[in-house]
Structures are given as structure tokens and as C-alpha cells.
């Protein structure tokens, strides 16, 4: 995969009403190259998370496209030089972060520390619905209630 290859992304520049035709924009961007502890994941499925809807409510206009998508499932297609837990070909799922482009794109860089192998008994679509909600439930059950 060369650095000059393009991928499809879906994002927004301005938090418009969802029924506005410009509320989401299809664009093309370069496929990123992983470094350090990053995985490059070919995204197979995503879910809509409450975090996505909250981030969309930002009414400011920005110069850069904002790509949402907090939860995702896909196949690892490249790894950074410090990655230890995953290999090319692994099917993974993850909850993203608000500091990076989200999963509403064909390929996504994800830090291996927020990734897990996707459950084999779930479809991509089913697994995509789990990451952040599972973490929230875990925190409630084991960190709050002990």
C-alpha cells in the first residue's frame, strides 16, 4: 500500500441539521501509514455512538474535515514498528478517541492499546456495536462497584 493511495471518508465541516444535504460530506483522503504503536485497520463495520452525536452538535465551522465514528471493526492491514499485540490479518474491534479521525472511513489508524481481537462468534456489524458500551459497562461493574 503506497502513501499516495486514496480512501473514501465521510465527515463534516460544520454541525448542520441532519436533514441538511451538507450535514455529511463524502471526500477522499490519503491512506495513513502506521508508526509507533498504531495499527492500520481496513474498516468493515461501524456503529453510531452517543459520542458521535454529541461531537456533531458542535456548531463551529472548521477548516479541516471532522471524521466521526467512535466504534469500529476491521482487519489489520499494516502495523507500526512498535506494535507487539497484533499482526496483519487480525480481525479487531475498538473504541476510538476524540483526538483522531474516527471510523467513518475506509482505513483508520488505531493505537493498539485500545484494540482487542473481535469475537469470532459475532458478525462485524454485531461486534461494532460493542466497544464503548462494553467499556462503559465494565467500568461500572468492576471499577465503580468493585
Where are these regions (language model features)?
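Extracytoplasmic/periplasmic beta-strand context in beta-sandwich domains
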Residues: 27, 90, 105-106
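NAD(P)H dinucleotide-binding glycine-rich loop of Rossmann-like/cofactor-binding domains
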Residues: 95-146
Amino acid at each position: 500500500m503506497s502513501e499516495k493511495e486514496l480512501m473514501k471518508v465521510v465527515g463534516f465541516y460544520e454541525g448542520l441539521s441532519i436533514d441538511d444535504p451538507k450535514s455529511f460530506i463524502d471526500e477522499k483522503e490519503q491512506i495513513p501509514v502506521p508508526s509507533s504503536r498504531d495499527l492500520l485497520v481496513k474498516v468493515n463495520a461501524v456503529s453510531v455512538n452517543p459520542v458521535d452525536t454529541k461531537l456533531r452538535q458542535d456548531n463551529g465551522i472548521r477548516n479541516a474535515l471532522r471524521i466521526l465514528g467512535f466504534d469500529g471493526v476491521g482487519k489489520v492491514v499494516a502495523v507500526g514498528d512498535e506494535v507487539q499485540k497484533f499482526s496483519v490479518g487480525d480481525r479487531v474491534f475498538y473504541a476510538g478517541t476524540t483526538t483522531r479521525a474516527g471510523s467513518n472511513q475506509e482505513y483508520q489508524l488505531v493505537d493498539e492499546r485500545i484494540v482487542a481481537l473481535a469475537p469470532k462468534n459475532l458478525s462485524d456489524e454485531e461486534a461494532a456495536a460493542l466497544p464503548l458500551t462494553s467499556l462503559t459497562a465494565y467500568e461500572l461493574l468492576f471499577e465503580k462497584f468493585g
